[in-house]
From Swiss-Prot:
GO terms for biological process: DNA replication initiation; regulation of DNA replication. This is Chromosomal replication initiator protein DnaA. Residues 189-405 are annotated as: Domain III, AAA+ region. It comes from Burkholderia cenocepacia (strain ATCC BAA-245 / DSM 16553 / LMG 16656 / NCTC 13227 / J2315 / CF5610). The lineage of its organism: Bacteria, Pseudomonadati, Pseudomonadota, Betaproteobacteria, Burkholderiales. Keywords: ATP-binding, Cytoplasm, DNA replication, DNA-binding, Lipid-binding, Nucleotide-binding. Belongs to the DnaA family. Domain I is involved in oligomerization and binding regulators, domain II is flexibile and of varying length in different bacteria, domain III forms the AAA+ region, while domain IV binds dsDNA.
Length: 525
Protein backbone atom coordinates (compact mmCIF):
# COMPACT_ATOMS: atom_id res chain seq x y z
CA UNK A 1 0.00 0.00 0.00
CA UNK A 2 2.76 2.43 0.94
CA UNK A 3 4.73 1.50 -2.17
CA UNK A 4 1.70 2.31 -4.28
CA UNK A 5 1.16 5.66 -2.57
CA UNK A 6 4.80 6.63 -3.13
CA UNK A 7 4.41 5.70 -6.80
CA UNK A 8 1.05 7.49 -7.09
CA UNK A 9 2.28 10.65 -5.33
CA UNK A 10 5.36 10.86 -7.53
CA UNK A 11 3.26 10.64 -10.70
CA UNK A 12 0.72 13.20 -9.48
CA UNK A 13 3.52 15.57 -8.45
CA UNK A 14 4.75 15.52 -12.06
CA UNK A 15 1.24 15.98 -13.48
CA UNK A 16 0.04 18.82 -11.23
CA UNK A 17 1.36 22.28 -10.51
CA UNK A 18 3.45 22.51 -7.32
CA UNK A 19 0.70 24.49 -5.58
CA UNK A 20 -1.99 21.94 -6.52
CA UNK A 21 0.16 19.02 -5.39
CA UNK A 22 1.05 20.59 -2.03
CA UNK A 23 -2.54 21.71 -1.39
CA UNK A 24 -4.45 18.56 -2.39
CA UNK A 25 -2.23 15.47 -2.64
CA UNK A 26 0.53 15.94 -0.08
CA UNK A 27 -1.87 16.10 2.93
CA UNK A 28 -3.44 12.73 1.98
CA UNK A 29 -2.36 9.43 3.50
CA UNK A 30 -3.24 5.79 2.68
CA UNK A 31 -4.74 4.11 5.76
CA UNK A 32 -6.00 0.70 4.62
CA UNK A 33 -5.95 -1.72 1.70
CA UNK A 34 -8.33 -4.69 1.57
CA UNK A 35 -6.96 -7.15 -0.98
CA UNK A 36 -10.04 -9.39 -0.79
CA UNK A 37 -12.44 -6.53 -1.57
CA UNK A 38 -9.99 -4.59 -3.76
CA UNK A 39 -10.58 -1.37 -1.82
CA UNK A 40 -8.06 1.32 -0.92
CA UNK A 41 -8.84 3.84 1.84
CA UNK A 42 -7.18 7.25 1.76
CA UNK A 43 -7.45 9.78 4.59
CA UNK A 44 -7.90 13.53 4.16
CA UNK A 45 -7.37 16.02 7.03
CA UNK A 46 -10.64 17.95 6.66
CA UNK A 47 -14.05 17.71 5.02
CA UNK A 48 -13.39 20.31 2.34
CA UNK A 49 -10.24 18.58 1.10
CA UNK A 50 -11.95 15.22 1.24
CA UNK A 51 -14.85 16.41 -0.94
CA UNK A 52 -12.59 18.26 -3.38
CA UNK A 53 -10.09 15.41 -3.84
CA UNK A 54 -12.95 12.93 -4.20
CA UNK A 55 -14.55 14.97 -6.99
CA UNK A 56 -11.39 16.06 -8.78
CA UNK A 57 -8.75 13.33 -8.31
CA UNK A 58 -10.46 10.07 -7.34
CA UNK A 59 -10.70 8.93 -10.96
CA UNK A 60 -7.00 9.47 -11.61
CA UNK A 61 -5.97 7.77 -8.36
CA UNK A 62 -8.22 4.80 -9.21
CA UNK A 63 -6.62 4.56 -12.67
CA UNK A 64 -3.14 4.51 -11.15
CA UNK A 65 -4.23 1.90 -8.58
CA UNK A 66 -5.63 -0.32 -11.34
CA UNK A 67 -2.34 -0.07 -13.26
CA UNK A 68 -0.30 -0.79 -10.11
CA UNK A 69 -2.27 -3.85 -8.93
CA UNK A 70 -3.41 -4.91 -12.40
CA UNK A 71 -7.04 -5.11 -11.25
CA UNK A 72 -9.87 -2.59 -10.68
CA UNK A 73 -9.54 -0.90 -7.29
CA UNK A 74 -12.27 1.01 -5.46
CA UNK A 75 -10.80 4.13 -3.86
CA UNK A 76 -12.54 5.30 -0.69
CA UNK A 77 -11.85 8.58 1.12
CA UNK A 78 -12.13 8.89 4.89
CA UNK A 79 -11.84 11.84 7.25
CA UNK A 80 -8.84 11.82 9.59
CA UNK A 81 -7.67 15.16 11.06
CA UNK A 82 -4.25 13.62 11.79
CA UNK A 83 -3.65 12.96 8.10
CA UNK A 84 -2.49 16.52 7.50
CA UNK A 85 0.14 16.17 10.26
CA UNK A 86 2.03 13.57 8.25
CA UNK A 87 3.26 16.24 5.86
CA UNK A 88 4.22 19.89 6.28
CA UNK A 89 1.53 22.48 5.60
CA UNK A 90 1.61 24.32 2.31
CA UNK A 91 3.01 27.50 3.77
CA UNK A 92 5.64 25.87 6.00
CA UNK A 93 8.40 25.39 3.47
CA UNK A 94 10.92 28.22 3.29
CA UNK A 95 11.04 30.11 0.05
CA UNK A 96 13.60 28.86 -2.42
CA UNK A 97 16.16 31.37 -3.66
CA UNK A 98 15.01 33.33 -6.65
CA UNK A 99 16.54 31.81 -9.78
CA UNK A 100 17.63 34.33 -12.41
CA UNK A 101 15.96 34.10 -15.77
CA UNK A 102 18.07 34.07 -18.88
CA UNK A 103 17.82 37.50 -20.54
CA UNK A 104 16.24 37.66 -23.95
CA UNK A 105 15.91 40.25 -26.68
CA UNK A 106 13.43 43.11 -26.62
CA UNK A 107 10.92 41.28 -28.79
CA UNK A 108 10.59 38.41 -26.36
CA UNK A 109 7.34 36.44 -26.26
CA UNK A 110 5.48 34.76 -23.43
CA UNK A 111 6.84 31.41 -24.61
CA UNK A 112 10.40 32.71 -24.29
CA UNK A 113 10.14 33.04 -20.52
CA UNK A 114 7.79 30.11 -19.88
CA UNK A 115 10.63 27.59 -20.06
CA UNK A 116 12.55 29.46 -17.35
CA UNK A 117 9.74 29.52 -14.78
CA UNK A 118 10.30 26.24 -12.98
CA UNK A 119 12.54 27.52 -10.22
CA UNK A 120 10.50 30.66 -9.67
CA UNK A 121 6.99 29.19 -9.93
CA UNK A 122 7.72 26.21 -7.69
CA UNK A 123 9.15 28.33 -4.90
CA UNK A 124 6.67 29.20 -2.17
CA UNK A 125 6.29 32.97 -1.90
CA UNK A 126 8.49 34.29 0.87
CA UNK A 127 6.93 35.76 3.97
CA UNK A 128 7.40 39.50 4.35
CA UNK A 129 10.65 40.39 6.11
CA UNK A 130 10.12 41.30 9.75
CA UNK A 131 11.78 44.70 9.39
CA UNK A 132 10.10 47.91 10.53
CA UNK A 133 9.35 50.42 7.79
CA UNK A 134 9.45 54.14 8.41
CA UNK A 135 8.25 55.82 5.20
CA UNK A 136 5.79 58.62 5.74
CA UNK A 137 2.15 58.32 4.78
CA UNK A 138 2.87 60.62 1.88
CA UNK A 139 5.36 58.15 0.48
CA UNK A 140 2.70 55.49 0.07
CA UNK A 141 0.15 57.90 -1.39
CA UNK A 142 -0.54 58.10 -5.12
CA UNK A 143 -0.23 61.59 -6.57
CA UNK A 144 -3.64 63.23 -6.99
CA UNK A 145 -4.69 64.79 -10.29
CA UNK A 146 -5.75 68.03 -8.61
CA UNK A 147 -2.30 68.90 -7.22
CA UNK A 148 -1.61 72.61 -7.43
CA UNK A 149 1.49 72.20 -9.60
CA UNK A 150 2.97 69.78 -12.06
CA UNK A 151 4.63 67.23 -9.82
CA UNK A 152 8.16 66.86 -11.16
CA UNK A 153 10.31 65.81 -8.19
CA UNK A 154 13.61 67.66 -8.28
CA UNK A 155 16.76 66.21 -9.81
CA UNK A 156 20.23 67.75 -9.61
CA UNK A 157 20.16 70.42 -12.30
CA UNK A 158 23.54 69.57 -13.81
CA UNK A 159 22.62 65.88 -14.02
CA UNK A 160 19.24 66.46 -15.65
CA UNK A 161 20.67 68.95 -18.12
CA UNK A 162 23.50 66.64 -19.12
CA UNK A 163 21.12 63.72 -19.53
CA UNK A 164 23.54 61.47 -17.66
CA UNK A 165 22.50 57.79 -17.91
CA UNK A 166 24.92 56.04 -15.54
CA UNK A 167 23.50 54.09 -12.60
CA UNK A 168 24.74 55.18 -9.19
CA UNK A 169 25.08 51.89 -7.31
CA UNK A 170 23.85 51.99 -3.73
CA UNK A 171 23.78 49.59 -0.81
CA UNK A 172 21.68 46.46 -0.91
CA UNK A 173 19.16 47.92 1.50
CA UNK A 174 17.03 51.01 1.78
CA UNK A 175 18.64 54.02 3.46
CA UNK A 176 18.71 53.63 7.22
CA UNK A 177 17.92 57.29 7.73
CA UNK A 178 14.13 57.65 7.97
CA UNK A 179 14.09 61.13 6.43
CA UNK A 180 16.16 59.99 3.47
CA UNK A 181 13.85 57.02 2.93
CA UNK A 182 10.81 59.29 3.10
CA UNK A 183 12.32 61.61 0.52
CA UNK A 184 13.22 58.71 -1.76
CA UNK A 185 9.70 57.28 -1.70
CA UNK A 186 8.12 60.72 -2.03
CA UNK A 187 10.14 61.41 -5.19
CA UNK A 188 9.39 58.05 -6.77
CA UNK A 189 5.73 57.86 -5.59
CA UNK A 190 6.32 54.17 -4.86
CA UNK A 191 4.32 52.37 -2.18
CA UNK A 192 7.01 50.68 -0.04
CA UNK A 193 4.52 48.09 1.22
CA UNK A 194 4.09 46.50 -2.23
CA UNK A 195 7.04 44.14 -2.71
CA UNK A 196 7.82 40.78 -4.31
CA UNK A 197 7.96 39.22 -0.83
CA UNK A 198 4.27 39.78 -0.11
CA UNK A 199 3.02 39.11 -3.65
CA UNK A 200 1.17 35.77 -3.59
CA UNK A 201 2.15 33.73 -6.64
CA UNK A 202 0.09 31.12 -8.48
CA UNK A 203 -0.57 29.76 -11.93
CA UNK A 204 -2.57 32.87 -12.84
CA UNK A 205 0.30 35.31 -12.36
CA UNK A 206 3.54 33.31 -12.40
CA UNK A 207 4.56 34.50 -15.88
CA UNK A 208 3.96 38.13 -14.94
CA UNK A 209 5.93 37.76 -11.72
CA UNK A 210 8.80 35.99 -13.48
CA UNK A 211 8.99 38.76 -16.09
CA UNK A 212 8.82 41.41 -13.37
CA UNK A 213 11.71 39.82 -11.48
CA UNK A 214 13.75 39.63 -14.68
CA UNK A 215 13.14 43.32 -15.34
CA UNK A 216 14.03 44.26 -11.75
CA UNK A 217 17.29 42.32 -12.09
CA UNK A 218 18.10 43.62 -15.60
CA UNK A 219 16.40 47.01 -16.11
CA UNK A 220 16.52 48.35 -19.64
CA UNK A 221 17.93 45.08 -20.99
CA UNK A 222 15.22 42.43 -20.89
CA UNK A 223 11.61 42.97 -21.94
CA UNK A 224 11.52 46.70 -22.64
CA UNK A 225 8.77 47.75 -22.43
CA UNK A 226 7.07 45.29 -20.11
CA UNK A 227 3.30 45.49 -20.63
CA UNK A 228 1.05 43.85 -18.01
CA UNK A 229 -2.68 43.61 -18.60
CA UNK A 230 -5.66 42.13 -16.79
CA UNK A 231 -8.84 43.01 -14.92
CA UNK A 232 -9.08 45.15 -11.81
CA UNK A 233 -7.70 43.85 -8.53
CA UNK A 234 -5.43 41.16 -9.98
CA UNK A 235 -2.06 42.57 -8.85
CA UNK A 236 -0.77 44.67 -11.76
CA UNK A 237 -0.13 47.73 -9.59
CA UNK A 238 1.43 45.57 -6.85
CA UNK A 239 3.89 44.06 -9.33
CA UNK A 240 5.09 47.32 -10.85
CA UNK A 241 5.57 48.86 -7.39
CA UNK A 242 7.52 45.71 -6.44
CA UNK A 243 9.84 46.26 -9.42
CA UNK A 244 10.45 49.86 -8.39
CA UNK A 245 11.02 48.96 -4.74
CA UNK A 246 13.47 46.21 -5.69
CA UNK A 247 15.40 48.65 -7.87
CA UNK A 248 15.59 51.17 -5.03
CA UNK A 249 17.07 48.47 -2.81
CA UNK A 250 19.61 47.37 -5.43
CA UNK A 251 20.50 50.82 -6.79
CA UNK A 252 19.66 53.54 -4.29
CA UNK A 253 20.48 56.34 -6.74
CA UNK A 254 18.07 55.14 -9.41
CA UNK A 255 15.68 57.78 -10.77
CA UNK A 256 12.27 56.09 -10.60
CA UNK A 257 8.74 57.39 -11.06
CA UNK A 258 5.42 55.63 -10.61
CA UNK A 259 2.50 57.57 -12.04
CA UNK A 260 -1.11 56.78 -12.84
CA UNK A 261 -2.06 57.58 -16.43
CA UNK A 262 -4.67 60.11 -15.28
CA UNK A 263 -2.01 62.05 -13.36
CA UNK A 264 0.28 62.00 -16.41
CA UNK A 265 -2.55 63.47 -18.51
CA UNK A 266 -3.06 66.15 -15.87
CA UNK A 267 0.65 67.01 -15.87
CA UNK A 268 0.66 67.36 -19.67
CA UNK A 269 -2.29 69.77 -19.48
CA UNK A 270 -0.60 71.85 -16.77
CA UNK A 271 2.70 71.93 -18.67
CA UNK A 272 0.83 73.13 -21.76
CA UNK A 273 -1.01 75.83 -19.80
CA UNK A 274 2.19 77.12 -18.18
CA UNK A 275 4.46 76.69 -21.20
CA UNK A 276 6.66 74.42 -19.07
CA UNK A 277 7.26 71.59 -21.54
CA UNK A 278 11.05 71.92 -21.37
CA UNK A 279 11.00 71.11 -17.64
CA UNK A 280 8.40 68.38 -18.23
CA UNK A 281 10.50 66.69 -20.92
CA UNK A 282 13.77 67.12 -19.03
CA UNK A 283 12.31 65.33 -16.03
CA UNK A 284 10.62 62.40 -17.77
CA UNK A 285 13.41 61.87 -20.32
CA UNK A 286 16.01 61.61 -17.53
CA UNK A 287 14.37 58.76 -15.59
CA UNK A 288 15.89 55.30 -15.19
CA UNK A 289 12.53 53.59 -14.62
CA UNK A 290 9.08 54.86 -15.61
CA UNK A 291 6.02 52.98 -14.33
CA UNK A 292 2.75 54.00 -16.02
CA UNK A 293 -0.42 52.50 -14.52
CA UNK A 294 -3.73 52.09 -16.43
CA UNK A 295 -2.57 53.49 -19.75
CA UNK A 296 -6.06 53.01 -21.21
CA UNK A 297 -6.77 56.47 -19.75
CA UNK A 298 -4.63 57.90 -22.60
CA UNK A 299 -7.45 56.95 -24.99
CA UNK A 300 -8.48 59.88 -27.18
CA UNK A 301 -5.91 62.27 -25.66
CA UNK A 302 -3.68 62.98 -28.65
CA UNK A 303 -1.37 65.57 -27.05
CA UNK A 304 -0.70 63.31 -24.08
CA UNK A 305 0.02 60.40 -26.41
CA UNK A 306 2.44 62.53 -28.45
CA UNK A 307 4.39 63.61 -25.37
CA UNK A 308 4.46 60.06 -24.03
CA UNK A 309 5.69 58.79 -27.40
CA UNK A 310 8.67 61.18 -27.28
CA UNK A 311 9.38 60.24 -23.65
CA UNK A 312 9.14 56.53 -24.49
CA UNK A 313 11.55 56.87 -27.43
CA UNK A 314 14.07 58.83 -25.34
CA UNK A 315 13.94 56.40 -22.43
CA UNK A 316 14.29 53.23 -24.50
CA UNK A 317 17.12 54.79 -26.56
CA UNK A 318 18.96 55.48 -23.30
CA UNK A 319 18.32 51.94 -22.03
CA UNK A 320 15.93 53.12 -19.34
CA UNK A 321 13.12 50.72 -18.44
CA UNK A 322 9.46 51.41 -19.21
CA UNK A 323 6.68 49.37 -17.58
CA UNK A 324 3.02 49.81 -18.49
CA UNK A 325 -0.24 48.35 -17.22
CA UNK A 326 -3.70 48.27 -18.77
CA UNK A 327 -7.03 46.57 -18.24
CA UNK A 328 -6.89 44.99 -21.69
CA UNK A 329 -4.58 43.69 -24.42
CA UNK A 330 -2.67 46.56 -26.13
CA UNK A 331 -4.31 46.15 -29.54
CA UNK A 332 -7.75 46.15 -27.89
CA UNK A 333 -7.31 49.63 -26.36
CA UNK A 334 -9.38 52.04 -28.42
CA UNK A 335 -8.26 55.58 -29.18
CA UNK A 336 -4.50 54.92 -28.89
CA UNK A 337 -2.11 55.94 -31.68
CA UNK A 338 -0.80 53.03 -33.78
CA UNK A 339 2.77 54.23 -33.16
CA UNK A 340 2.33 53.64 -29.44
CA UNK A 341 0.66 50.27 -29.93
CA UNK A 342 3.60 49.13 -32.06
CA UNK A 343 6.01 50.27 -29.33
CA UNK A 344 4.06 48.36 -26.71
CA UNK A 345 4.24 45.24 -28.89
CA UNK A 346 8.02 45.55 -29.26
CA UNK A 347 8.62 44.31 -25.72
CA UNK A 348 6.90 41.62 -23.67
CA UNK A 349 3.14 41.57 -23.10
CA UNK A 350 1.87 39.33 -20.28
CA UNK A 351 -1.66 38.78 -18.98
CA UNK A 352 -2.53 38.43 -15.30
CA UNK A 353 -5.52 36.15 -14.89
CA UNK A 354 -7.99 35.80 -12.01
CA UNK A 355 -6.45 33.66 -9.24
CA UNK A 356 -7.14 29.94 -9.14
CA UNK A 357 -8.59 28.27 -6.04
CA UNK A 358 -5.32 27.40 -4.31
CA UNK A 359 -3.99 30.91 -4.89
CA UNK A 360 -7.18 32.48 -3.52
CA UNK A 361 -6.83 30.41 -0.35
CA UNK A 362 -3.18 31.48 0.03
CA UNK A 363 -4.14 35.14 -0.44
CA UNK A 364 -6.86 34.93 2.22
CA UNK A 365 -4.69 33.15 4.78
CA UNK A 366 -1.75 35.49 4.26
CA UNK A 367 -3.97 38.57 4.51
CA UNK A 368 -5.59 37.22 7.68
CA UNK A 369 -2.15 36.52 9.13
CA UNK A 370 -1.08 40.11 8.40
CA UNK A 371 -4.17 41.25 10.35
CA UNK A 372 -3.17 39.09 13.31
CA UNK A 373 -6.06 36.66 12.76
CA UNK A 374 -5.77 32.88 12.63
CA UNK A 375 -8.13 31.98 9.78
CA UNK A 376 -8.95 28.28 9.56
CA UNK A 377 -8.29 26.48 6.32
CA UNK A 378 -11.93 25.41 6.07
CA UNK A 379 -13.15 29.01 6.17
CA UNK A 380 -10.50 30.12 3.67
CA UNK A 381 -11.53 27.36 1.27
CA UNK A 382 -15.21 28.22 1.68
CA UNK A 383 -14.63 31.88 0.79
CA UNK A 384 -12.22 31.07 -2.04
CA UNK A 385 -14.64 28.57 -3.55
CA UNK A 386 -17.44 31.14 -3.74
CA UNK A 387 -15.52 34.29 -4.67
CA UNK A 388 -13.55 33.97 -7.87
CA UNK A 389 -13.06 37.31 -9.56
CA UNK A 390 -10.08 39.16 -8.06
CA UNK A 391 -7.85 39.84 -5.08
CA UNK A 392 -9.66 43.03 -4.03
CA UNK A 393 -12.94 41.14 -3.78
CA UNK A 394 -11.29 38.51 -1.56
CA UNK A 395 -9.70 41.12 0.70
CA UNK A 396 -12.99 43.02 0.92
CA UNK A 397 -14.80 39.83 1.90
CA UNK A 398 -12.20 39.09 4.56
CA UNK A 399 -12.61 42.59 6.02
CA UNK A 400 -16.38 42.02 6.23
CA UNK A 401 -15.85 38.71 8.02
CA UNK A 402 -13.39 40.22 10.51
CA UNK A 403 -15.68 43.18 11.23
CA UNK A 404 -18.74 40.93 11.62
CA UNK A 405 -16.84 38.63 13.98
CA UNK A 406 -15.61 41.54 16.11
CA UNK A 407 -19.00 43.27 16.22
CA UNK A 408 -20.87 40.12 17.30
CA UNK A 409 -18.11 38.83 19.57
CA UNK A 410 -18.06 35.43 17.85
CA UNK A 411 -15.26 33.24 16.54
CA UNK A 412 -14.86 33.01 12.78
CA UNK A 413 -16.53 29.88 11.43
CA UNK A 414 -18.18 28.84 8.20
CA UNK A 415 -21.59 29.67 9.69
CA UNK A 416 -20.45 33.16 10.69
CA UNK A 417 -18.86 33.61 7.25
CA UNK A 418 -22.15 32.73 5.55
CA UNK A 419 -23.92 35.36 7.65
CA UNK A 420 -21.27 38.03 7.06
CA UNK A 421 -21.19 37.48 3.30
CA UNK A 422 -24.89 36.75 2.82
CA UNK A 423 -25.48 39.49 0.22
CA UNK A 424 -22.23 38.78 -1.61
CA UNK A 425 -22.86 35.04 -1.77
CA UNK A 426 -26.37 35.61 -3.13
CA UNK A 427 -24.87 37.42 -6.11
CA UNK A 428 -22.12 34.82 -6.57
CA UNK A 429 -24.64 31.98 -6.57
CA UNK A 430 -25.77 33.14 -10.00
CA UNK A 431 -22.86 31.16 -11.32
CA UNK A 432 -21.60 30.68 -14.85
CA UNK A 433 -23.08 27.48 -16.25
CA UNK A 434 -21.40 24.94 -18.51
CA UNK A 435 -24.24 25.49 -20.99
CA UNK A 436 -23.46 29.21 -21.12
CA UNK A 437 -19.78 28.44 -21.67
CA UNK A 438 -20.63 26.08 -24.53
CA UNK A 439 -22.83 28.69 -26.22
CA UNK A 440 -20.30 31.51 -25.77
CA UNK A 441 -17.39 29.45 -27.11
CA UNK A 442 -19.48 28.14 -30.02
CA UNK A 443 -20.47 31.69 -31.00
CA UNK A 444 -16.87 32.90 -30.67
CA UNK A 445 -15.49 30.18 -32.98
CA UNK A 446 -18.52 30.13 -35.29
CA UNK A 447 -19.59 26.53 -34.72
CA UNK A 448 -22.89 25.00 -33.57
CA UNK A 449 -23.60 24.45 -29.89
CA UNK A 450 -24.54 20.87 -30.78
CA UNK A 451 -20.93 20.32 -31.88
CA UNK A 452 -19.89 20.68 -28.24
CA UNK A 453 -21.41 17.34 -27.32
CA UNK A 454 -21.25 15.61 -30.69
CA UNK A 455 -18.72 12.93 -31.62
CA UNK A 456 -17.29 14.99 -34.50
CA UNK A 457 -13.51 15.38 -34.38
CA UNK A 458 -12.41 17.86 -37.08
CA UNK A 459 -9.88 20.39 -35.74
CA UNK A 460 -12.24 23.34 -36.18
CA UNK A 461 -14.67 21.61 -33.77
CA UNK A 462 -12.36 19.63 -31.46
CA UNK A 463 -10.28 22.67 -30.56
CA UNK A 464 -13.21 24.90 -29.42
CA UNK A 465 -14.64 21.91 -27.56
CA UNK A 466 -11.37 21.52 -25.62
CA UNK A 467 -11.36 25.25 -24.88
CA UNK A 468 -14.91 25.02 -23.56
CA UNK A 469 -13.93 22.07 -21.33
CA UNK A 470 -10.98 24.08 -20.01
CA UNK A 471 -13.21 27.07 -19.23
CA UNK A 472 -15.80 24.81 -17.59
CA UNK A 473 -13.11 23.47 -15.26
CA UNK A 474 -11.75 26.97 -14.50
CA UNK A 475 -15.02 28.88 -14.12
CA UNK A 476 -17.45 26.39 -12.57
CA UNK A 477 -17.46 24.04 -9.60
CA UNK A 478 -18.32 21.00 -11.71
CA UNK A 479 -16.16 17.91 -11.31
CA UNK A 480 -14.37 16.36 -14.28
CA UNK A 481 -16.96 13.54 -14.63
CA UNK A 482 -19.81 16.09 -14.48
CA UNK A 483 -18.18 18.21 -17.19
CA UNK A 484 -17.61 15.12 -19.33
CA UNK A 485 -21.29 14.19 -19.00
CA UNK A 486 -22.33 17.66 -20.23
CA UNK A 487 -20.04 17.28 -23.24
CA UNK A 488 -21.84 14.28 -24.69
CA UNK A 489 -21.04 11.73 -22.01
CA UNK A 490 -17.28 11.91 -22.41
CA UNK A 491 -14.96 10.20 -19.93
CA UNK A 492 -13.33 12.35 -17.22
CA UNK A 493 -9.89 11.49 -18.63
CA UNK A 494 -10.88 13.17 -21.91
CA UNK A 495 -11.78 16.32 -20.00
CA UNK A 496 -8.55 16.15 -18.00
CA UNK A 497 -6.53 15.83 -21.22
CA UNK A 498 -8.30 18.88 -22.71
CA UNK A 499 -7.77 20.97 -19.56
CA UNK A 500 -4.06 20.16 -19.38
CA UNK A 501 -3.55 20.67 -23.11
CA UNK A 502 -5.17 24.12 -23.21
CA UNK A 503 -3.51 25.22 -19.95
CA UNK A 504 -0.10 24.24 -21.31
CA UNK A 505 -0.65 25.91 -24.68
CA UNK A 506 -2.02 29.05 -23.02
CA UNK A 507 1.33 29.65 -21.32
CA UNK A 508 3.15 29.48 -24.66
CA UNK A 509 0.69 30.88 -27.22
CA UNK A 510 -0.03 34.62 -26.87
CA UNK A 511 -2.92 34.49 -29.36
CA UNK A 512 -4.67 31.63 -27.52
CA UNK A 513 -4.11 33.41 -24.22
CA UNK A 514 -5.74 36.53 -25.63
CA UNK A 515 -8.74 34.56 -26.97
CA UNK A 516 -9.23 32.89 -23.58
CA UNK A 517 -8.99 36.26 -21.84
CA UNK A 518 -11.73 37.66 -24.10
CA UNK A 519 -13.95 34.62 -23.49
CA UNK A 520 -13.46 34.82 -19.71
CA UNK A 521 -14.32 38.51 -19.62
CA UNK A 522 -17.41 37.86 -21.78
CA UNK A 523 -18.61 35.07 -19.50
CA UNK A 524 -18.03 37.10 -16.33
CA UNK A 525 -19.93 40.06 -17.76
Amino acid sequence: MNDFWQHCSALLERELTPQQYVTWIKPLAPVAFDASANTLSIAAPNRFKLDWVKSQFSGRIADLAREFWNTPIEVQFVLDPKAGMRSAPAGAAPAAPRAPLAPNGPAATVAAIAANLTANASAAPAAPADVPMTPSAAAARHLNADDADIDLPSLPAHEAAAGRRTWRPGPGAAPANGGEADSMYERSKLNPVLTFDNFVTGKANQLARAAAIQVADNPGISYNPLFLYGGVGLGKTHLIHAIGNQLLLDKAGARIRYIHAEQYVSDVVKAYQRKAFDDFKRYYHSLDLLLIDDIQFFSGKSRTQEEFFYAFEALVANKAQVIITSDTYPKEISGIDDRLISRFDSGLTVAIEPPELEMRVAILMRKAQSEGVNLSEDVAFFVAKHLRSNVRELEGALRKILAYSKFHGREISIELTKEALKDLLTVQNRQISVENIQKTVADFYNIKVADMYSKKRPANIARPRQIAMYLAKELTQKSLPEIGELFGGRDHTTVLHAVRKIADERSKDAQLNHELHVLEQTLKG
